Each structure stands twice: as structure tokens, then as C-alpha cells.
Amino acid sequence: MEKPVVLGTLGTVYGIKGWLKVNSFTDVAEAIFDYNPWMINQNGVWRELKVSAWKRHNKGLICKIDGIDLREDALALTNVEIGVPADLLPALPEGEFYWRDLIGCSVSTTKGYDLGKVTELMETGSNDVLVVEANVKDAFGAKERLIPFLEEQVIKHIDLTARTIEVDWDPGF
């Protein structure tokens, strides 16, 4: 089985009837409940569980899991990852990408300089940022580069099949 895509985590227990707080990583927090059942990662093992109810609470979300009716039972589920199979994610329009698809891509400049590989992405408010781990023998001594994900301005071409990203970026920066 392919590793599920992590969409959030279960947080602390809420109340005495087995409800749990939910930390959603989806753009619209409630969208995490569009997927049911969930896969959860407990001690490195993914298993399925069903959400029987959910609601907004204050500024967050809480949920009820099938078969979990006591606070003590819910404690075993705190701080576990919530995932779904990748094939359940909606298809994106042309030119849009899931972050998970960009991680691991090789990044090079339009002049052919190999900058390294994408290790993560950051959301900054104004635009997303590629975190690129530099090659061990980088001529500029860089360990990591932060490259703004600005299509057309900086990002020139993305080829997910070849796992490459071409950027207009000064390697010394």
C-alpha cells in the first residue's frame, strides 16, 4: 500500500465522551471531513477508522470516531497523523500541483546549474516558498535555498514525470 497523504493530526481529547480535537492541514479546514474513512498512523502502522460525527468548536474542529466512546479510549489516538490514499484527492487543473508532488524534485536554473532537491514547501502568506537542499559540493557553499514559488517570474517549468523544476534564480543567492 502506498503511504497515505497526511491531511492533519488528531489533537487532544475533548470532553468525556471520546471526542478529539482535529488539526487540519487542508486549505479549508473542514475539507478534511470530506474523506471518510481516514487512515491513521499509530506507531508507524497505518489503519482505517471512521468518523461518525464532527463539528466546529470555538475556532477549531472536533470529531467523534466510531467505537470510541470514552475519554480513556480517545487518549490512545492523540497526536496521530490523519491520512487518505492519494488517489482520493481531487484532480487539479493544468498548471496546479500538490506540494507532495514537488517534494523530491531536482531544481536547476535556466542556465543549467543544479541547485539541489526540494525538501519541503512553506506557506508565507504572500506566496509559497520552495526549500531546496543544496548539493554537498555546491560551488557557492549553500546548504539550503529558499526560492519563491512565483510562476512565470521564478518558476519557469515543472516536469513531474522527470521530477524536475527549472527556475530563473541566481545560484549565489
Swiss-Prot record:
GO terms assigned for molecular function: ribosome binding
Give any Pfam family that matches.
Answer: RimM
> Which Gene3D superfamilies does the protein's record reference?
PRC-barrel domain, RimM
Please report the stretch or stretches of sequence annotated as the PRC barrel domain.
94-173
Task: Give the CC-aspect GO terms.
Answer: cytoplasm; ribosome
Stated family:
Belongs to the RimM family.
**Purpose:** An accessory protein needed during the final step in the assembly of 30S ribosomal subunit, possibly for assembly of the head region. Essential for efficient processing of 16S rRNA. May be needed both before and after RbfA during the maturation of 16S rRNA. It has affinity for free ribosomal 30S subunits but not for 70S ribosomes.
Give the domain note.
The PRC barrel domain binds ribosomal protein uS19.
What's this protein's name?
Ribosome maturation factor RimM
Protein source organism: Aeromonas salmonicida (strain A449)
Its lineage reads: Bacteria, Pseudomonadati, Pseudomonadota, Gammaproteobacteria, Aeromonadales
